[in-house]
Protein backbone atom coordinates (compact mmCIF):
# COMPACT_ATOMS: atom_id res chain seq x y z
CA UNK A 1 0.00 0.00 0.00
CA UNK A 2 2.91 2.36 0.71
CA UNK A 3 3.99 2.20 -2.94
CA UNK A 4 0.45 3.03 -4.05
CA UNK A 5 0.31 6.00 -1.66
CA UNK A 6 3.62 7.30 -3.02
CA UNK A 7 2.06 7.13 -6.49
CA UNK A 8 -0.98 9.05 -5.20
CA UNK A 9 1.26 11.73 -3.67
CA UNK A 10 3.10 12.10 -6.96
CA UNK A 11 -0.17 12.28 -8.86
CA UNK A 12 -1.48 14.90 -6.43
CA UNK A 13 1.53 17.10 -7.18
CA UNK A 14 0.80 16.70 -10.89
CA UNK A 15 -2.90 17.53 -10.40
CA UNK A 16 -2.02 20.74 -8.57
CA UNK A 17 0.43 21.73 -11.31
CA UNK A 18 -2.26 20.98 -13.91
CA UNK A 19 -4.77 23.22 -12.11
CA UNK A 20 -2.28 26.09 -12.20
CA UNK A 21 -1.44 25.49 -15.87
CA UNK A 22 -5.09 25.34 -16.96
CA UNK A 23 -5.95 28.48 -15.00
CA UNK A 24 -2.95 30.37 -16.37
CA UNK A 25 -3.99 29.43 -19.91
CA UNK A 26 -7.60 30.34 -19.12
CA UNK A 27 -6.56 33.80 -17.92
CA UNK A 28 -4.50 34.40 -21.05
CA UNK A 29 -7.39 33.35 -23.30
CA UNK A 30 -9.81 35.55 -21.38
CA UNK A 31 -7.48 38.54 -21.88
CA UNK A 32 -7.52 37.78 -25.61
CA UNK A 33 -11.32 37.76 -25.68
CA UNK A 34 -11.64 34.00 -26.06
CA UNK A 35 -14.24 33.62 -23.32
CA UNK A 36 -15.58 30.23 -24.38
CA UNK A 37 -12.15 28.61 -24.52
CA UNK A 38 -11.22 30.27 -21.23
CA UNK A 39 -14.33 28.83 -19.56
CA UNK A 40 -13.59 25.36 -20.94
CA UNK A 41 -10.10 25.44 -19.42
CA UNK A 42 -11.52 26.72 -16.13
CA UNK A 43 -13.97 23.79 -16.13
CA UNK A 44 -11.09 21.38 -16.71
CA UNK A 45 -9.23 22.97 -13.78
CA UNK A 46 -12.32 22.40 -11.61
CA UNK A 47 -12.28 18.72 -12.60
CA UNK A 48 -8.60 18.52 -11.70
CA UNK A 49 -9.35 20.07 -8.31
CA UNK A 50 -11.93 17.35 -7.67
CA UNK A 51 -9.30 14.72 -8.50
CA UNK A 52 -6.84 16.40 -6.13
CA UNK A 53 -9.40 16.47 -3.31
CA UNK A 54 -10.10 12.76 -3.80
CA UNK A 55 -6.38 11.94 -3.69
CA UNK A 56 -5.99 13.92 -0.47
CA UNK A 57 -8.91 12.01 1.02
CA UNK A 58 -7.39 8.64 0.03
CA UNK A 59 -4.01 9.60 1.50
CA UNK A 60 -5.57 10.81 4.74
CA UNK A 61 -7.43 7.50 5.05
CA UNK A 62 -4.02 5.82 4.87
CA UNK A 63 -2.64 7.89 7.75
CA UNK A 64 -0.76 10.46 5.70
CA UNK A 65 -0.86 13.98 7.12
CA UNK A 66 -2.05 16.04 4.19
CA UNK A 67 -3.02 19.20 6.09
CA UNK A 68 -0.36 21.42 4.48
CA UNK A 69 -1.13 20.13 1.00
CA UNK A 70 -4.86 20.45 1.56
CA UNK A 71 -4.39 24.03 2.78
CA UNK A 72 -2.25 24.85 -0.26
CA UNK A 73 -4.94 23.42 -2.54
CA UNK A 74 -7.65 25.49 -0.84
CA UNK A 75 -5.55 28.66 -1.18
CA UNK A 76 -4.97 27.92 -4.87
CA UNK A 77 -8.67 27.26 -5.50
CA UNK A 78 -9.66 30.45 -3.69
CA UNK A 79 -7.08 32.43 -5.66
CA UNK A 80 -8.53 31.14 -8.93
CA UNK A 81 -12.13 31.35 -7.64
CA UNK A 82 -12.79 27.67 -8.33
Residue map of PLM features:
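Non-heme di-metal
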Residues: 1-82
